[in-house]
Amino acid sequence: MFLLHEYDIFWAFLIIASLIPILAFWISALLAPVREGPEKLSSYESGIEPMGGAWLQFRIRYYMFALVFVVFDVETVFLYPWAMSFDVLGISVFIEAFIFVLILVVGLVYAWRKGALEWS
């Protein structure tokens, strides 16, 4: 007897969910006209001609702040479900979550000591 028959709906959903975007891209590639020209290669900026060059330098500090923000944002995403079911999970999951937070705090202290969080 096939034991995975309970997942038939899941596999059907997965196949249909995969086929819809593939078919949409395929049909649009089949029906859309392909026109090469200078207008396709020009940049578009709110309907007006762009002024100046498109290459702007920005400080790497913005990147570091964004990276630290993403790390702690992902931490929040992982810790929220744990906090909602804290009373059911027990002490072992609490220790795992504590180790997870401790690793992130060590990373934050490392970034702080390296000067990654200094603005000037």
From Swiss-Prot:
Please give the catalytic activity noted in the UniProt record.
Answer: a plastoquinone + NADH + (n+1) H(+)(in) = a plastoquinol + NAD(+) + n H(+)(out); a plastoquinone + NADPH + (n+1) H(+)(in) = a plastoquinol + NADP(+) + n H(+)(out)
Q: How does the protein associate with the membrane?
A: Multi-pass membrane protein
**Subcellular location(s) per record:** Plastid, Chloroplast thylakoid membrane
**Keyword NADP part of the UniProt annotation:** yes
The reply on keyword Transmembrane helix is yes
Q: Give the family this protein belongs to, as stated in its UniProt record.
A: Belongs to the complex I subunit 3 family.
* Protein name stated in the entry: NAD(P)H-quinone oxidoreductase subunit 3, chloroplastic
Organism, by scientific name, is Oryza sativa subsp. japonica
